[in-house]
């Protein structure tokens, strides 16, 4: 299924962006509100089976919205990571928070990182940002090389909040915000770095432990936030 795919991380990102529709954005693509939109976590192989059941053939094909599967940011990152690794490009999923959504200053988000041998660094890419996303969010940067500060790993967000650089209430998803949420994402990020991805819905019971946090103050880290 991957044999006819391009080798460019940018082209692979574009392909993934056309395979999935984020459930929270379905209405923007003209998907009827009564449409069943499964949100179960899927491995890359299962996602490919579903993709082929909707539109058999090359993954390069331009897909109408009704021929795409439904998912979340985690699913985009899994597919992009899978394709990059197939091309022997070192890649990994990261869990943290993005600053380019309008729902929360630091919105819960998953992306993919790949190693650039030319630049000798890990490059962060967001496969969710298709043309519709970029237009509605006013995004002008390259989604295959996220500028510094547009995405923070969970660990960076933890340091920023604990150091007083930003209110913990500005970090999370919807009404679920604060240190407990950041810590959940720290566990998720650690696990995906160990090749043990967890469900985006797995909180590990962390909110119940919120009262146990230490009040130790940390010095603010040097993190540049994109304006």
Regions found by a protein language model. Give the residues of each.
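His-Asp-centered catalytic microenvironments across diverse enzyme cores
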Residues: 13-14, 18-22, 31-33, 97-110, ...
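Active-site neighborhood of thiol-dependent amide/isopeptide-bond enzymes
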Residues: 37-110
